[in-house]
Amino acid sequence: MKIFQELIDSGSIKEEKIDFVLMKKVLAKSRRSIRSSKLILNDGDSEGSYELAYEAMLLAGRALVFSFNYRPRATGSHKIVADFVKKVLNDNEDVKLAFKFDKMRKNRHYLIYGAGLAISEIEAKNAISSANSLLEKIEIIIEEKNPQKKLEI
């Protein structure tokens, strides 16, 4: 597709047919990460909760990439997925969600490799909410593309 040409030309994504069964499994794992994020937050671990909420967004984003019959290359895959999501989600509210995902990617990177960043309970709750919204949006997009979806009679 033309909107992905830059990612294709740079070698960031490659064409690969991926079935809907795998996409459903990745989406289910994303949903589990959101549930785990809530549990960890209730236990007082805001940073762990934030990281799991980000993981849920990453998994949902990967499923979205798969739904267009692409796979991100391994090196830099988190950024590639975030960039791909930005290209697909293009209405006003969805763009905000895609940018939240990218901001969370950068924060999570700093949590893992940097020092001094603390995540508050409010930030973790917002991350969970954003992860849930992104997952729901991506589930709708993927379901619309599913050739096996139920016929409405």
Range-by-range predicted roles:
Residues M1-I153:
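Terminal alpha-helical segments
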